[in-house]
């Protein structure tokens, strides 16, 4: 992680939105989750992806400075992202420009489908498939289980939300016994495993962190374009990390007190409030080699179930 020095003096204000930004920055720094490279990826995917995918280095530096991240940390993070194949750099005269690499395009789009989905719940009648392996599950199979959205519920038992004739190839285990059921009783043990897989503890913490942010947005005047962009970037940075790890499950298996649906709805509501002013900041400040950013494409309006 690049060393980050927060410069929060400019944020001290009675403005509740500025206070919300400062509070979240402090919390992320305290938990060692304020990663410059992750913030940059969040901004590039969330804000720049729908608007052509390319932005100037100066635009990125301006936003990161508002988030207390110095130029040196940004340069270090960009160098790391470029070396790892996440970002492509180009120059036009004296100006540098960044874009997410085409090699990670499908990864980014796949992530977006989970981050901005209207729900992480599958229909209640989604098939529940039990796969009982004849042998201990290898590390490769365990990774495949996570990748396809399945769940290990016993040492050699996998729960997969798929009909038998559509079982992912990686889970078609030789010698395995397969049992398909339209319903499955959620006992204590399974409930606890599902709670872990749905990131219940961290989702609850995120809900508690952003309820005051939502209240501040409802009570205060509209945030400045710069603060709206900064808060949007921070929130998606935090939400993205959890949304990509939440297991999508049939609605009939979800605990009544599962906090994820409420948290997703809260994030969607805040996002909608921030969208207008944050896009105005991009209109006024973000540049490409051709000038201003192009208008957003259709996928921006479809996020969180929009129309």
Predicted regions and their residues:
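Mid-protein regulatory/catalytic core that forms ligand/cofactor-binding pockets
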Residues: 135-227
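Short acidic, hydrophobic short linear motifs in intrinsically disordered regions
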Residues: 51-63
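Short, Lys/Arg-rich nucleic-acid/phosphate-binding segment
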Residues: 91-97
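Glycine-centered, phosphate/nucleic-acid-interacting loop/turn motifs that mediate DNA/RNA or nucleotide
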Residues: 85
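Short, amphipathic alpha-helical interaction segments positioned at domain boundaries
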Residues: 105-126
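Short alpha-helical segments that sit at the start of domains
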Residues: 15-43, 105
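Short amphipathic alpha-helical interaction segments
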Residues: 69-80
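C-terminal regulatory/effector modules of DNA-binding transcriptional regulators
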Residues: 195-307
């Amino acid at each position: 992680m690049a060393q980050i020095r927060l410069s929060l003096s400019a944020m001290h204000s009675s403005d509740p939105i500025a206070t919300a930004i400062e509070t979240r920055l402090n919390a992320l720094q305290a938990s060692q989750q304020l990663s410059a490279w992750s913030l940059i990826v969040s901004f590039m995917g969330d804000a720049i992806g729908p608007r052509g995918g390319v932005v100037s280095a100066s635009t990125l530096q301006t936003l990161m400075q508002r988030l207390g991240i110095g130029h040196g940390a940004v340069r270090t993070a960009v160098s790391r992202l470029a070396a790892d194949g996440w970002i492509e750099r180009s120059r036009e005269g004296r100006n540098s420009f960044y874009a997410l690499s085409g090699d990670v395009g499908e990864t980014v789009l796949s992530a977006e489908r989970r981050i901005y989905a209207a729900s992480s719940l599958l229909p209640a009648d989604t098939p529940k498939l039990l796969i009982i392996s004849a042998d201990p599950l290898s590390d490769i199979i365990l990774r495949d289980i996570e990748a396809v959205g399945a769940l290990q519920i016993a040492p050699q038992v996998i729960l997969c939300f798929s009909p038998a004739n559509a079982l992912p190839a990686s889970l078609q285990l030789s010698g395995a016994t397969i049992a398909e059921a339209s319903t499955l009783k959620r006992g204590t043990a399974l409930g606890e495993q599902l709670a872990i897989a749905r990131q219940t503890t961290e989702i609850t913490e995120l809900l508690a962190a952003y309820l005051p942010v939502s209240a501040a947005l409802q009570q205060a005047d509209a945030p400045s374009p710069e603060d709206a962009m900064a808060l949007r970037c921070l929130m998606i940075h935090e939400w993205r990390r959890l949304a990509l790890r939440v297991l999508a499950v049939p609605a009939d298996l979800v605990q009544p007190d599962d906090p994820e649906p409420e948290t997703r709805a809260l994030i969607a509501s805040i996002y909608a409030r921030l969208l207008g002013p944050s896009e105005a900041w991009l209109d006024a400040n973000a540049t490409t080699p051709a000038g201003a950013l192009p208008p957003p494409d259709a996928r921006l309006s479809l996020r969180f179930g929009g129309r």
